[in-house]
């Protein structure tokens, strides 16, 4: 799976999860607003121990989980998820990603 910039840690897991393919058509800013407001199958949690722009994104066969401490981290996670949704037309490879700016 190609994501730019390459996350600091990414583990590919078996399986896939299907998000609504229409999400792939949204521009990034609109996609971020959808993630923030709530997308079926995507759970967003606040984890105060994560750094300001740090995030964890996990895709499992049952859905997507995003953890961040604030909107900056959530935006970075949404950017990564947007790339995945766009490339796979909604079909996401299961994976565990943790990233923050270097």
Feature locations, PLM:
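Acidic, contiguous N-terminal accessory segments
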Residues: 1-100
